[in-house]
Amino acid sequence: MPSQIPEGWGEAPRPRRPEPARICGVNAVRALFLRRPEAVIRLHYLAERRPVAGPLCRYLARHHKAYREVLDDELTRIAGTEHHGGIVALAEPRRALPMPNPPPPILFAGSVLPVLDGIGNPHNLGAIARGAAFFGAKAMILSDDPRQADLSDAAYRTSEGGLEHMAVFRAEHLPSLLRRLSGQFLVTAAVAAGGQPPHALPRGKPIALVLGNEESGPSPEVLACCEARITLAGSGLVESLNVAAATAVLMHALMGPKA
């Protein structure tokens, strides 16, 4: 008697569909609908967010996508956090793109290009993106350091929409990339001590601003590829600023007129 082999037995399992990104908060959700509306899967919101959600729901209705008003405990469950801001969009996930060769033109669209070398906290990544977008950065590079955070729900939430306005790339080997960029950028490391003030940098070409790991700063190999180092002068009462706060101050200084 022939054996009955279940259909599909022995076949490789189908790859699981990636979990959707959970984009939380009014500013982040608005930026998502502005920049990547086709990526939205569905929308959930509290009654108090009806004025914000109304136009977004009309867009979703036209494109036959789901939306629903929910209570706070359900929105917290959907968001995975109580810090949901009253509105959550589920969207197709986005990850940092591999850096192409040659580098894409968008890297040169702003006067300062943030380069993150081992920034491990996704909240810091998001806050850096928020400040960078505020000051007009168009792109950001993430290092190949295994500590480096990628785009995530937490990063999107803290970026307040900033990540949606930036192209994000991941370097295959950051020191090699910085050496390639050095002819077109002034590659500059932000360091806690020993650097020159930001206003002292020459302004003949855009600046690739290297921001190091929260605890240890840029790696020695990356520092060796930097043509300049800059440091913010403080009171001396604390060692340094949080990396996201320091980035915002540095970008403001570097984008202003040279002193």
Residue spans of the language-model regions?
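Short beta->alpha connector loops at strand-helix junctions that form conserved
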Residues: 71, 117, 143-144, 172, ...
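Amphipathic alpha-helical repeat scaffolds
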Residues: 25, 120-128, 240-246
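RNA substrate-binding interface of SAM-dependent RNA methyltransferases
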Residues: 38, 55, 105-196
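N-terminal positively charged helical leader segments and presequences
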Residues: 1-103
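Structured adenosyl-cofactor binding patch, chiefly the S-adenosyl-L-methionine
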Residues: 30, 35, 131-134, 151-162, ...
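Active-site/ligand-binding-proximal alpha/beta "capping" segment
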Residues: 187-238, 242
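Short, ordered loop/turn segments at secondary-structure junctions
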Residues: 48, 72-74, 144-147, 215
